[in-house]
Design a protein with these regions (language model features):
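Gly/Ser/Thr-rich helix-start
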Residues: 17-20, 28, 84, 94-95, ...
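Inter-motif core of Ras-like GTPase G domains
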Residues: 292-316
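Glycine-rich, N-terminal phosphate-binding loop of Rossmann-like dinucleotide-binding domains
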Residues: 26, 91-93, 243, 278, ...
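A glycine-rich (often HGG/GG-containing) alpha/beta subdomain
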Residues: 1-149, 153, 336
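C-terminal-of-GTPase-core extension/linker across diverse P-loop GTPases
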Residues: 2-11, 15, 145-267, 273, ...
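Structural motif
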Residues: 275, 310-312, 338
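Switch I (G2) and immediately adjacent beta-strands of P-loop GTPase domains
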Residues: 57-67, 72-76, 256-287, 305
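Hydrophobic alpha-helical scaffolding
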Residues: 91, 251-252, 296, 313, ...
Length: 463
């Protein structure tokens, strides 16, 4: 990365109008550069003499002219975010003052920071591991408190510690195996099959637990695309409005009111749903409404893209051919059947047994009266796995980490199978080495430059 050993600066707060704008400066000449453009209010104060973890009030100067009141926060190396000398300068929010401050710093010798360059320096200077660096953007992008807690657990180093325990156990096993094979004259105790396979099985189970929790963790952090499907006038838009908490979609007794997809993000329990209310799905003949037909095609297309399906049925009417077609299309997907209009249901109730083969969950509701909302909330959390997930526990937080953990798990499975099928310890040792290499890739201990660049290409400037 360019400027890795220069002094850099960037806006650390969102651009535009706001209460304050904060510019971060990091590098070996941070104090010298800021000293050129910062004038303390109190006589006798200077940037050069400022101690770490202190603040100073002053004004910043642009081409010698006093521009705006400014608060400087000082961090001395190595006790800073990047491990370098860091100064954070806060001025009044707004583009003009922030841009003026950046211009002053760059004129005085700072280089503009690239995306993620502050965190990259923290990694280079040993302030955080690669998994912690990845967690930085996860914390920023997290949706909901539990998603943020999950990302923060990785930022706090819990994932690195959990992977470290697995690595230590496997390295100890590998060292024993290597000593026994390579130095027979040293009278190293023989490694029994039970002990060898037992350790591999235990650590494989630990990786299985991490891998199995990835999808639910991703849902907590980023939310899930959820499509509302059903034939016309079953109450999809009423359900959307209930979940949104306001009248987002038009609701009328006229079937087919919704023609195009209506989008709305909502928080349902601990899960953020990116809802898509679709046109009612039904068979439209060749001479039918072309606009409605296009809306239905889009509805079916959305089904293929969704991470969660809420299939809505009118509980007061028998299942129609269109209902059964919807049920068949939902089979094998993360789908919940919502039996709406329970207040009108009587002898014509939809038989649950007819729908059970197609849906993992069935929830009776009356969306108009908000009846069954908690049951739907619980069903969504249970189906997506977030109900069982501990947000304080260490979890994988990127596709890269998942791929590395999967490689390690698969290598351990091969090592176990090798011994169980009568292959020698040398064959199992190769698989064990592969597993350790995958774990080193995960934590970043042996990460290539390409891997590190891949991690930081998603970062924003200022972080």
């Amino acid at each position: 990365m360019e400027h890795l050993h220069t002094t850099i600066c960037a806006l650390a707060t969102p651009p535009g109008e706001g209460g304050i704008a904060t510019v971060r400066v990091s590098g070996p000449d941070a104090y010298g550069i800021v000293g050129k453009i910062f004038a303390p209010v109190r006589q006798g104060k200077s940037v050069a003499d400022a101690k770490g973890y202190t603040a100073m009030l002053g004004h910043y100067l642009l081409h010698g002219a006093e521009m705006d009141e400014c608060v400087a926060l000082f961090f001395r190396a190595p006790h800073s975010y990047t491990g370098e000398d860091v100064i954070e300068l806060s001025v009044h929010g707004g583009t003009a003052m922030a841009d003026g401050l950046l211009e002053a710093l760059i004129t005085a010798g700072c280089a503009p920071a690239g995306p993620g360059e502050f965190t990259r320096r923290a990694l280079e200077n040993g302030r955080m591991s690669l998994t912690q660096a990845e967690a930085v953007m996860e914390v920023i992008a997290a949706n909901g408190r539990q998603g943020a807690a999950l990302a923060k657990s990785a930022l706090d180093g819990r994932l690195a510690k959990r992977i470290g325990k697995i690595q230590t156990a496997l390295q100890t096993l590998n060292a024993h195996l290597t000593a026994w094979v390579d130095y027979p004259e040293e009278d190293v105790p023989e490694l029994s099959d039970a002990a060898f396979v037992g350790t591999l099985t235990e650590q494989k189970a630990a990786l299985d637990a991490l891998i199995s929790g990835y999808s639910a963790g991703a849902v907590l952090r980023h939310g899930v695309d959820c499509v509302l499907l059903g034939r016309p006038n079953v109450g999809k838009s009423t359900l959307l409005n209930l979940l949104a908490g306001f009248d987002r979609a038009i609701v009328t007794p006229v079937a087919g009111t919704t023609r195009d997809i209506v989008e709305q993000a909502v928080q349902l329990g601990n899960v953020r749903l990116n809802l898509f209310d679709t046109a009612g799905v039904r068979e439209v003949g060749a001479d039918g409404d072309a606009i409605e037909a296009e809306g239905i095609r889009r509805s079916w297309r959305k089904l293929d893209e969704a991470g969660l399906v809420l299939a809505v049925f009118d509980a007061a009417q028998p299942l129609s051919d269109d209902d059964l077609e919807l049920a068949r299309r939902c089979q094998g997907r993360p789908a919940i059947a919502v039996l709406n209009k329970q207040d009108l249901a009587g002898k014509t109730d939809v038989p649950r047994g007819t729908l059970e083969p197609y849906f993992k969950k069935i929830v009776p509701m009356c969306a108009r009266d908000a009846v069954g909302l908690q049951a739907l909330t619980d069903a969504v959390a249970d189906l997506l796995g977030t109900a069982q997930l501990d947000p304080e526990a260490a979890q994988l937080c990127s596709a890269r980490q998942l791929a590395a953990a999967t490689r390690a798990r698969d290598a351990l499975a091969e090592a176990i199978a090798a011994r169980q099928n009568g292959f020698g310890l040398d064959a199992a040792a190769v698989c064990l080495t592969d597993a350790l290499q995958a774990l080193f890739d995960l934590t970043g201990e042996n990460a290539s430059d390409a891997t590190i660049e891949e991690v930081f290409e998603t970062f924003c400037v200022g972080k």
